[in-house]
């Protein structure tokens, strides 16, 4: 449409490419100010606005300014789009933490599977837009119809058969461009809808991290692998939560008012400091509630019901899976949801029933209702064998390089044959590891309700040992502080040696 010259286009691409820089610089400020969830909503909403604004500009704006207005829309869209480079990794990490918080399992690997599903959906829908383009005139029939008019308007064409020539016709261009904008707006709108249900706030995320640390504390203590640093950090979290158990949130509005009423720079600085401290105090109170709820989780009615179910399942063992009545799932779904507590009970009942139904299917199909516990110690043996073979291969290659240097053809042939056999052996081990992984996965799926019940009972038992862990606090803290001091002294020593070495080199050069 001859919207700009070649020089103007070069300038436009340069300016447009710079937008992402500012987006990535502004993203942390937005996250700090309004949080990740609201930032996601904001940028996706603005994405719709800026994309949609391009169409009326192209259709109605004067040609002399049209390209610059389009540049503004594209630049702003690229700016808010660049927020995603900062937000996406952070949001994905938060989602993983939340999943571990609610299920007790880390499912990082599943995110790759979800990405593959997205790729398949993209491939399946990639033909939709070209089909729509063809319907509105982006086809050879339309080109043949408009070709005389286009040639009269543009002069001789390099390739008259190129279907893209129809874009020289303004009405056709506007129609096709409108389809592109409409599809983009619809896609952006569909993308923003899920974020209206994203309710994981920064405060809740901080609380989740602390709860996960508490769970790790008891699990590590039960397994005899608790580190001094983890013990000290987590007990401090619990102590702070207990100290804030009866605390009341501070009136943030009063602190904001104090900032406005401050008459000089120093007073305003003090007021802002007090305001930030009050905000953090309120955050600590909210987090302490989550920590205390976690500490008392097995003392609640819901927690006791979970333990009773777990004891029953663990005592029956795999028979609990074989004999499970699948109608229990329908009964669970029929439970009332009138109150928040009832919703929690129903959600748990449905989740437990689904676990049993799925496990029952796997047990019947893969184990003929005779589940045999998988011996996970086989992995240690296989990995050790794999490491040994890899070390032998590395050592053989070292001998091969030496033989090559010495031009010892007999040794070269012998070592190559040796490496070939070692690689075959490693391939066999890798296949055994793969088979063992599959068997372990099948067992975990078939025995899932029993495994979860056993884990819950162990977790509840570990939670009763808080006093034992607290009794180790002072000694662990002393050891931890000494370790930190030793590390500081060592770091200072290394830094001093570097400076002395650098000074020596400078003196020698002088």
PLM regions and their residue ranges:
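Membrane-embedded alpha-helical bundles of multi-pass transporters/translocases
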Residues: 1-226, 230, 273, 282, ...
């Amino acid at each position: 449409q001859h919207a700009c010259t070649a020089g103007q286009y070069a300038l436009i691409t340069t300016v447009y490419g710079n937008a992402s820089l500012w987006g990535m610089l502004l993203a942390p400020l937005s996250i700090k100010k309004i949080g990740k969830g609201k930032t996601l909503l904001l940028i996706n909403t603005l994405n719709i606005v800026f994309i949609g604004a391009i169409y009326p500009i192209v259709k109605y704006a004067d040609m002399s300014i049209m390209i610059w207005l389009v540049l503004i829309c594209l630049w702003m869209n690229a700016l808010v789009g660049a927020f995603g480079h900062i937000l996406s990794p952070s949001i994905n990490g938060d989602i993983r933490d939340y999943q571990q918080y609610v299920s007790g399992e880390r499912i990082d690997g599943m995110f790759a599977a979800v990405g593959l599903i997205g790729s398949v959906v993209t491939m399946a829908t990639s033909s939709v837009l070209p089909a729509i383009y063809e319907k509105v005139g982006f086809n050879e029939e339309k080109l043949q119809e408009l070709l005389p008019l286009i040639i009269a308007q543009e002069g001789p064409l390099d390739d008259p058969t190129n279907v893209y020539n129809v874009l020289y016709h303004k009405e056709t261009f506007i129609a096709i461009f409108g389809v592109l904008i409409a599809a983009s707006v619809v896609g952006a709108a569909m993308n923003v809808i899920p974020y209206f249900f994203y309710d994981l706030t920064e405060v809740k995320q901080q609380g989740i991290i602390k709860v996960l640390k508490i769970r790790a504390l008891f699990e590590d203590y039960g397994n005899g692998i608790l580190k001094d640093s983890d013990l000290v950090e987590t007990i401090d979290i619990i102590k702070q939560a207990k100290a804030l158990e009866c605390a009341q949130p501070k009136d943030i509005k009063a602190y904001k008012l104090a900032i406005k009423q401050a008459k000089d720079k120093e007073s305003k600085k003090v007021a802002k400091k007090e305001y930030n401290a009050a905000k953090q105090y309120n955050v600590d109170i909210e987090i302490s509630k989550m920590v205390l709820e976690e500490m008392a989780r097995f003392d609640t009615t819901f927690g006791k019901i979970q333990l009773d179910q777990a004891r029953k399942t663990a005592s029956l063992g795999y028979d609990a899976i074989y004999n499970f009545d699948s109608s229990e799932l329908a009964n669970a779904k029929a439970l009332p949801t009138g109150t928040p507590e009832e919703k929690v009970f129903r959600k748990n009942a449905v989740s437990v029933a689904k676990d049993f139904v799925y496990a029952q299917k796997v047990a019947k199909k893969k184990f003929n209702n005779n589940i045999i516990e998988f011996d996970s110690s086989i992995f240690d043996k296989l990995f050790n064998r794999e490491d040994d073979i890899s070390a032998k291969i590395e050592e053989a290659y070292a001998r091969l390089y030496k033989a090559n240097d010495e031009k010892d053809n007999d040794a070269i042939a012998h070592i190559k044959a040796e490496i070939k056999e070692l690689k075959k052996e490693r391939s066999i081990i890798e296949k055994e590891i793969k088979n063992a992984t599959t068997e372990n996965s099948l067992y975990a799926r078939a025995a899932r309700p029993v495994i979860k019940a056993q884990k819950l009972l162990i977790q509840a038992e570990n939670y009763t040992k808080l006093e034992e862990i607290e009794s180790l606090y002072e000694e662990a803290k002393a050891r931890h502080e000494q370790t930190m001091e030793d590390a500081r002294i060592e770091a200072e020593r290394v830094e001093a040696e570097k400076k002395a070495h650098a000074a020596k080199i400078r003196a020698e050069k002088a």
